[in-house]
Design a protein with these regions (language model features):
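Hot-dog-fold acyl-thioester-processing enzymes
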Residues: 1-91
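HotDog/MaoC-like acyl-thioester-processing domains
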Residues: 1-17, 100-105, 109-134
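Glycine-rich loops and low-complexity Gly/Arg-rich segments
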Residues: 46-51, 88-89, 97, 113-114, ...
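Short histidine-centered beta-strand/loop micro-motifs
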Residues: 61-62, 85-86, 98-99, 119-122
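Mid-chain, well-packed structural core segment of small domains
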Residues: 84-89, 94-102, 108
Length: 134
């Protein structure tokens, strides 16, 4: 019988272009989560904190801070993607296609777009990925 332990991260040679990792970690956003992130980052815009103010704006309810969503999605991918990485070198494009509200649950997945050896460090490689949340 083979017993496999859950893997935390992957080594460079384990990544294959086209592979998709559906991240098992999910997150339901609470009002406390959003409030704490606003406090920590000093983002006190009332659309993120004031229910009465937000009710009279475009979305009609409190809008969760986009940078919090970005942070969560990156965090959701760590176990599968960057757990063994030396560094996250770059984030090329961050978009928020839909608003996120208190009570929404986020799911994320990452697709491997490209894998190449480093041009400057022969013992390393670079993995290009696209991570999306739904």
């Amino acid at each position: 019988m083979n017993i496999h332990n859950e893997q935390f991260g992957r080594f460079f040679n384990e990544f294959k272009v086209g592979e998709i990792y559906k991240h098992s970690v999910t997150k339901t956003i609470t009002e406390s989560d959003n409030n704490l992130f606003c406090l920590l980052t000093m983002n006190h815009h009332p659309v993120h904190l004031d229910k009465e103010y937000a009710t009279n704006k475009t979305h009609g309810e409190i809008l969760v801070v986009g940078s919090y969503i970005f942070s969560l999605v990156v965090g959701m991918s760590v176990k599968d993607i960057s757990g063994k990485a030396i560094a996250n070198l770059n984030y090329e494009k961050v978009t928020h296609d839909k608003p996120v509200f208190i009570g929404d649950t986020l799911y994320a997945q990452t697709e491997v777009l490209d894998v190449r050896e480093s041009k400057t460090k022969s013992d390393r490689g670079i993995v290009y990925v696209e991570t999306i949340a739904v």
